[in-house]
Amino acid sequence: MTNTEIFDKLRDAIVNQDVAGTPELCKEALALGIPALDIITKGLSVGMKIVGDKFEAAEIFLPQIMMSGKAMSNAMEVLTPELEKNKKEGDEAGLAITFVAEGDIHDIGHRLVTTMLGANGFQIFDLGVDVLNETVVEEAAKHKGEKVLLVGSALMTTSMLGQKDLMDRLKEQKLRDSVKCMFGGAPVSDKWIEEIGADATAENAAEAAKVALEVMK
């Protein structure tokens, strides 16, 4: 089986909510010498992007999202130890405060991005899901003067709108200049990031790690 065929199978396993088969495919891919990062970026993340697009278009609903998320979680149990082995040593890239927006409990992409940031040298403080903007601002204030990156996720357009409110609150509390702000999720676009005055977004978790490192330079 070629690498491309493996990646296609991984993609389809996520889209088809194959909870048991996805981690087994990951083991097969690792045994073939495919790096964990490639398994995520070229296979699993492609599947999650399709799932996110289908959800946004109301082609699938929460039960399907949850099952695809379970398949992804099972895959990450196999892959995270491999990512840890290759974790970059040296100075911490900074503190990444990660969270899912208020009103949103979809944490699949959030968990994946958090894992990838940790594997790339960030210290992680994970606030979890359905997080109030007030809570994010409070945490940012506690770490004023440090290298801080706020990483917010929203799968739904309604919860994405709260990102603008967060940016406004950071400005009001005079914290905006002391943190970098990065947002992701199916409805988030470059245009939206520019509109609300944030620093960056990314297409997938692996790209998020690269963009985050660039933003924090």
UniProtKB/Swiss-Prot annotation:
Cross-referenced SUPFAM superfamilies: Cobalamin (vitamin B12)-binding domain, Methionine synthase domain
CDD domains recorded: corrinoid_protein_B12-BD (cd02070)
Pfam families: B12-binding, B12-binding_2
The protein's assembly and partners: Can form a complex with MtmB.
Similarity comment: family membership: Belongs to the methylamine corrinoid protein family.
Residues reported in the UniProt entry to bind methylcob(III)alamin: H106
SMART domains: B12-binding_2
Keywords: Cobalt, Metal-binding, Methanogenesis, Repeat
Gene: mtmC2
Name of this chain's protein: Monomethylamine corrinoid protein 2
Source taxonomy: Archaea, Methanobacteriati, Methanobacteriota, Stenosarchaea group, Methanomicrobia
Domain B12-binding: 93-217
